[in-house]
Swiss-Prot record:
Subunit organization: Heterodimer of AddA and AddB/RexB.
Cofactor(s) listed in the protein's UniProt record: Mg(2+)
Positions with a binding annotation for ATP: 24-31
Region (Disordered): 291-319, 556-594, 1051-1126
CDD domains: DEXQc_UvrD (cd17932)
Species: Desulfitobacterium hafniense (strain Y51)
One Gene Ontology term from the biological process aspect of the record: double-strand break repair via homologous recombination
Name of the protein in its database record: ATP-dependent helicase/nuclease subunit A
Length: 1392
């Protein structure tokens, strides 16, 4: 194995023995350390432990596979260098043992253990693991059966439970509560015991005992937090009052307020409940502010406007402090505790019944799984525990495993739950001197509490174990901190440190961010003066959605909040509702969220386009070993959740021309293709379902339109569509109602139902069919198919039925022809796969499958669209922060930082906590009234604190994904006001970290980010210098704040340096001419669009027709008609005869490519002297034949077209590592150069940039000739080379009246910063062998193209182009065209 230079802490983690907890920060190389530790013990001469005697537990199967691969690679490298026969034999043996080594997830380990000892727990050895969908359905069925039994028994306790937790309509809320409670209990080591102890939380006889309990301590903490927030606000009010011109007469009252709240905080800390109540009554009694006008300045120096502002802001801060105490009153003091005690005991009885029913359900569910011979995922862990422990002591199996495993290594230890922790303890040795548990993780990245992960397990060891000090030795239990980051640039690391030193505290984030936790730069990024590498500040983009008009992209007006970076305090802005949690079904809130997301998406898209199209900076490509420009695939957009905004972002990115892919867990069932197939399945199962039936009739499966559907419905206004379909199929045909007809029974059933009105119905049917025969055709085609499918559904499997429907209807092929066809087909295949998996369970049948899907959706669950994007595709990816964990990306955008944290889970009447148990309200069953309980408040408060700590860690995970650049985006209502608030919060904090109470009061990520950035010494918000900014850790970190008051591209943005540039560069003169023509053009005098123009004839013909129409209208108007009627008729006539005034814009292309322009110019050159008749038949069209991708059966052939070979050569040249080879190329022998180039081609194939066929089409000699040629010398010697430079220009073509967007990609731009000039280089693979004058041919073919390239470089890069160079690979020769020469070719087509 290679011997990297390990840091002292890493070496200690590799060498030391005992029970070790390695706190490995983001990017610290934890996986490499774990692999090296394992490898060292396998290969050490003294130890030489076989690899299968280690248990390596990973979080995912992918991580296990990667670990196994890394160990295998290390063994292979060791084998290559081994000299001794014994060593070779040992390594070969380890290579063979590797495939049976226990490198696995904990679930897989438990599975193997159960399969080995199944007989001890009386489990069938052929058991299978039910997937989550099957388990959900089985749980639901079991619980419904259990409820039926309880209802039959009519027990009062159960009835009280139903009355307390059900509704007046059903008992679904109670069922949901029991399922949640059962799931939560199964994450405990002893679920039964945990459930039995739940009523104890409600058994209290003394207030003092309650207040000293864990629940009481949480209540105290909640009061302290709110009081602390109130004190911060009062401090702000006080500071405003004492400013020059401020309301100094407020100061005595504010001092008294602070004193009373301070006393309340003290009592909440250590007083009795009576003390707290008394202190609260005093604190909440805010006296009125004095009305005096005492001032601290002479009248001559007072600015009345400023004085009024200070008075209002001071009063507002005090009013907000009052609200904090109002929140305490509405929660802790809403019902006096003395009144709660007797109710709490009654609630304890209710909780006891709930626990008993849940335990009963657990037993019945276990029986149901045994009957089906399946287990769920929680069973795997609990069965393993059953095998490993008895009466809480290790079994023989556990002792055997402890003796067998040399060491147990656990990755991602911060994400395990108590059950998993117990399993690991039982299979590892714990006694001093023999401990062999090695744990790796980072509690700052523990973000899976919703999966029952308990970061407290990590934190307890982290706090109790001694920490390794450099030079120190081993200890029985030891923490080793790895904080050197080998992933990110120093600018990224310093920014992360600067932020989290201030906002991650033990009270708010459950761990303090200190010197041990802070990241230290370890990655090496070469800074080449000739390259624009990615070092730069972390950008923070903020906007007020209420201040931007989305339709215009401009700020709404002077009445809106001022958001300028230079003067955020000046504008008051409109009063907008804020800090309101969106409620379910709140359409206005949802629309507002969508509009905010759309604004943010446009801002993000503009920033990405600027970065990519303008080649703003280069990133380091590890595989290439060189720097290259940013590509879309290098960019990821992280969000807390994609559910509600992914589609909005995708839509805006597509408009901006940015390829994008969002992998979500929603939206699948809402797609048209899936909805149509599910509707078809529903009517196959039950044709009486009208809504699905109508959906199928309107779909391409039948093809009826709305009118036809209406005519069908008119047959039986009170019936259903199935009956109308049968009647239409029958249509009075006597043969079809005879007994021998294949659909006799179906037709006779419907005819018999409507026997009395049958004659009238027959008349109706015949009338419809006479007037609309196409209805009969469609019904005759569909009805027999429907009957055949219904018959098939009863005798074939669900999966077979579904695939038969795809083939029989051709629907799978049909959706492939629609836009996004590949995605639609993938979605339908996912549905088929879901049907296959469903039938692998004990459930069968179409009805049950549809019922399963309905329940799945009714629980708010969904599936994401099928993934059709590969890892190597050049697209911007949207992923959630949770999905990004463990990954890294060159450029990271973090969006949605202004979105409020989701607190919906805290609104449930049943709250669950592993230590505090169940929190329910005080329920008056008789009167059906609920009151908040102190236990519920305590559980809710603790859950909120833990949720906030997790949100803080989620932010840390998001920020640490970035390797080279970070861009943060968020919205803030009343942005100017918020910035002032952030400043006040920052001023009131004398310490490095903000107070816990303030941090726990956050509603959005910006509530943490804003105050921290305000303190930065660079004065990011232009508010004036901050007193203690330079004393903050990592205060030298680089940040840039951009405050947007308009959407990028529509107007300027205000920021510390410069505004964003335009991406598309329009021809200003052309736009001006267009505006002038619009002002002077008269509607009605333009030619109608869509007609072939015959010179001298069209206009007169149209005028004649218009005149005749007008005369006909006048002739039909009675002479007695009044003037208003005639005017109305003239207005109707005018509107109906209106013609679009700019027909030329309809018939021309709005966007074209350089290649298309080149093709058209060549056609005009070839046809300049052709006859009109010949030219009219072959002239180029804006709607030329599309160029489709080659079919797979052609692509897979070895032969490539010349164009495909040219593309392959261009790709190989584009990715040549010029900077890496520049200094050594001339010194290398020819065979070494050829070997390097061959490896370069092979690398492109491995990275899927080239296919194997394309790689074979690239000649090593071609690449070597280029690098050794005059053109190659230009590339080596250029100060900066930019390859594959995309551009978009707005140009006025001589052949068109309207401007057109022209897009293209330049092969290479060679920049000389010293001379301030550029050269354009284009690589051509045309076969020019035998051409007498290749220079003339290339000039004629590509003069226009190079002229456009030169124009693009000069406009985009603001650098004059000296000359254009064509390198012909077939001739190994360059041809130089001066700027003046290509200009002539350009001006023949473009108005410059």
């Amino acid at each position: 194995m290679n011997n990297p230079k390990w840091t002292p802490a890493q070496q200690a983690a590799i060498d030391l023995k005992g029970q070790l907890l390695v706190a490995a920060a983001a990017g610290s190389g934890k996986t490499a350390v774990l692999v090296q530790r394992l490898f060292k013990q396998i290969t050490d001469v003294d130890e030489q432990v076989d690899v299968d005697r280690f248990l390596v537990v990973t979080f995912t199967k992918a991580a296990a596979a990667e670990m196994r691969e890394r160990i295998g690679k290390a063994l292979d490298e060791a084998l290559f260098g081994a000299a001794e026969p014994a060593q070779v034999e040992h390594l070969l043996q380890q290579r063979a043992l590797l495939y049976r080594a226990s490198i696995t997830t904990l679930h897989s380990f438990c599975m193997e253990l159960i399969r080995q000892y199944f007989y001890l727990i009386e489990l069938d050895p052929a058991f299978r693991v039910a997937d989550e969908a099957e388990a959900d359905l089985l749980r639901q069925d079991t619980l419904e059966d259990l409820f039926e039994a309880y209802y039959g028994e009519e027990t009062p306790a159960f009835q009280s439970l139903v009355d307390a937790f059900g509704t007046d309509r059903d008992d679904q809320p109670l069922m949901a509560s029991i399922l949640r409670l059962h799931e939560f209990a199964m994450s405990q080591v002893h679920p039964g015991e945990w459930l039995e102890h739940l009523p104890a939380a409600y058994d209290w006889h003394s207030l003092d005992d309650l207040m000293e309990s864990p629940w009481g301590q949480v209540v105290r903490q909640g009061v302290r937090d709110k009081v602390e927030e109130g004190l911060i606000l009062l401090e702000r009010a006080y500071r405003l009052a004492e400013l020059p011109g401020g309301p100094v007469h407020y100061l005595p009252v504010l001092e008294d307020d602070q004193s009373r709240l301070g006393f309340l905080r003290e009592m909440a800390e250590k007083g009795t409940w009576s003390d707290i109540e008394t202190a609260f009554k005093s604190a909440a009694a805010f006296p009125g502010l004095p009305r005096g006008s005492k001032k601290n300045l002479p009248d001559s120096l007072i600015d009345e406007e400023n004085s009024k502002r200070l008075r209002e802001e001071s009063k507002k801060a005090r009013d907000e402090a009052k609200k904090k105490l109002e929140e305490i009153k509405n929660t802790v003091f809403s019902v006096p505790l003395t009144d709660q005690l007797p109710f709490l005991n009654k609630m304890g009885e209710l909780v006891g019944t709930l626990a008993q029913v849940t335990q009963h359900f657990a037993r019945e569910y276990q029986k149901a799984k045994r009957q089906r011979n399946c287990v769920d995922f929680s069973d795997l862990e609990h069965y393993a525990l059953q095998l490993l422990a008895k009466d809480k002591q290790p079994t023989e199996i556990a002792l055997k495993l402890q003796a067998y495993y040399a060491e147990v290594l656990v990755d991602e230890y911060q994400d395990i739950n108590p059950v998993q922790e117990r399993i690991l303890q039982l299979v590892s040795r714990q006694e001093e001197g023999k401990a062999n548990l090695f744990m790796v993780g980072d509690v700052k990245q523990s973000i899976y509490r919703f999966r029952m992960a308990d970061p407290g397990l990590f934190l307890r060891k982290y706090g109790e174990f001694p920490h390794y000090q450099e030079g120190g030795g081993a200890a029985p239990n030891l923490v080793i901190d790895l904080n050197q980051n080998f992933r990110s640039r120093p600018e990224v690391i310093q920014g992360i440190n600067y932020l989290f030193y201030q906002i991650m505290t033990e009270g708010a984030g459950e761990i303090i961010y200190d010197e041990q936790a802070a990241l230290r730069p370890g990655a090496k990024f070469v800074s080449d003066g000739e390259l624009r590498t990615a070092e730069g500040p972390i950008e923070v983009h903020l906007f007020d959605p209420k201040a931007i008009d989305l339709s215009l992209g401009q700020k709404r007006g002077a009445e809106d909040a001022a958001t300028g970076a230079d003067s955020p305090a000046k504008g008051e802005g409109e009063e907008f509702e804020q800090n309101r949690e969106p409620e379910s079904g709140d359409d206005e809130s949802s629309l507002e969220e969508a509009e905010t997301a759309r604004i943010e998406a446009r801002l993000v898209a503009a920033r990405i386009q600027k970065m990519v199209l303008e080649r703003e900076f280069q990133i380091h490509d590890k595989e290439l070993g060189d720097y290259r420009p940013v590509q879309y695939a290098d960019i990821v957009i992280l969000m807390r959740s994609l559910a509600s905004v992914a589609s909005v972002y995708a839509e805006e990115f597509q408009k901006a021309g940015i390829p994008v892919y969002a992998e979500t867990n929603s939206g699948y069932f809402g797609t048209n293709e899936v909805d149509t197939v599910l509707s078809l399945l529903k009517i196959i199962d039950n044709p009486r379902l009208d809504i699905p039936f109508a959906a199928v009739l309107r779909s391409p499966l039948v093809g009826m339109n709305g009118t036809e559907l209406g005519k069908l419905r008119s047959l039986l206004p009170q019936g259903d569509f199935y009956e109308t379909l049968v009647l239409t199929f029958w249509a009075g045909d006597a043969h079809r109602q005879e007994e021998g007809h294949e659909f006799y029974s179906e037709i006779r059933e419907i005819l018999g139902k409507h026997w009395e009105s049958l004659p009238q119905l027959e008349v109706k049917v015949r009338h419809i069919l006479e007037t609309s025969p196409e209805i009969k055709e469609k019904v005759d085609a569909f009805f027999p198919k429907l009957q055949e499918w219904r018959h098939r559904s009863r005798r074939t499997s669900l999966a077979d039925l579904l695939w038969h429907l795809y083939e029989d209807t051709g629907y799978l092929a049909y959706v492939g022809t629609l836009p996004a066809g590949a995605q639609r087909q993938a979605n339908l295949r996912v549905l088929y796969d879901r049907a296959c998996r469903y039938e692998a369970t004990n459930y069968r049948g179409l009805f049950r499958f549809l019922r399963f899907l309905e329940k799945f959706q009714s629980q708010g669950k969904d599936l994401g669209n099928a993934s059709i994007v590969g890892e190597k595709e050049n697209v911007v990816r949207f992923i959630t922060v949770h999905s990004s964990k463990g990954l890294e990306f060159p450029v990271v955008f973090i969006a949605g930082l202004g979105k409020k944290f989701n607190t919906r889970s805290l609104s449930s009447q049943l709250l669950l906590h592993s230590h505090l148990g169940v929190g329910i309200p005080l329920i008056d069953i008789e009167n059906q009234v609920r009151y908040p309980s102190v236990i519920q408040y305590a559980v809710k408060e603790r859950l909120w604190q833990e949720a906030l700590a997790e949100e803080l860690r989620i932010l840390y995970v998001a920020l640490t994904r970035g390797k080279e650049r970070l861009f943060l985006f968020g919205h803030q209502h009343k942005l100017a006001e918020a910035i002032n608030k952030w400043r006040s919060l920052a001023l009131s904090c004398p310490d490095t970290a903000f107070p816990d109470g303030q941090l726990r009061g956050a509603k959005t990520y910006l509530d943490w980010l804003g105050p921290a950035l305000v303190r930065h010494p660079e004065d990011l918000f232009k508010l004036g210098s901050f007193p203690t900014a330079s004393e903050l850790p990592d205060s030298s970190s680089q940040w840039k704040v951009i405050l947007h008051d308009q959407i990028a591209g529509k107007g300027p943005v205000q920021e510390a340096t410069s505004s964003q540039d335009e991406i598309i560069l329009p021809d200003q003169e052309t736009l001006g001419e267009r505006e002038a023509s619009e002002e002077t053009e008269i509607p009605g005098e333009t030619e109608a669009s869509g007609k072939t123009e015959i010179p001298g004839e069209t206009k007169n013909s149209e005028e004649t027709k218009t005149s005749e129409d007008k005369k006909n209208l006048e002739a039909q108007t009675p002479e007695t008609a009044d003037l208003d009627t005639k005017n109305l008729q003239e207005e109707v006539f005018r509107q109906l005869n209106w013609q679009y005034p700019y027909p030329e814009g309809v018939n021309q292309s709005a966007k074209t490519s350089v290649s298309e322009l080149k093709r058209q110019s060549l056609w005009y050159m070839d046809n300049e002297y052709s006859s009109p008749s010949s030219s009219s038949s072959s002239s180029p069209s804006a709607l030329s034949a599309p160029s489709f991708l080659r079919p797979q059966f052609i692509v897979s052939r070895k032969e490539l077209t010349p164009a495909e070979r040219g593309t392959a050569v261009h790709a190989a040249i584009q990715h040549l590592p010029l900077a890496l080879w520049r200094d050594t190329w001339e010194e290398l022998a020819q065979e070494v150069r050829e070997s390097m180039l061959q490896e370069h081609i092979d690398s492109l194939i491995r990275r899927e940039i080239l296919s194997a066929e394309q790689g074979g089409a690239v000649s090593v000699s071609q690449l070597k000739n280029l690098l050794d040629s005059t053109s190659g010398k230009r590339l080596w010697e250029a100060e900066e080379v930019r390859r594959e430079v995309p551009f978009t220009l707005s140009l006025r073509l001589r052949a068109q009246k309207e401007p057109v967007l022209v897009q293209g990609i330049i092969d290479a731009v060679l920049l000389s910063h010293q001379e301030h000039e550029a050269q354009v280089m284009d690589f051509k693979t045309d076969n020019l062998a035998g051409v007498p004058d290749p220079e003339l041919v290339l000039t004629q073919r590509y003069g226009l193209q190079l002229g456009l390239y030169a124009l693009a470089v000069e406009r985009l890069l603001k650098v004059p182009v000296r000359e254009c160079i064509i390198y012909a690979t077939s001739l190994n020769r360059e041809f130089v065209m001066q700027r003046e020469a290509v200009q002539a070719a350009l001006e023949s087509v473009v108005i410059v």
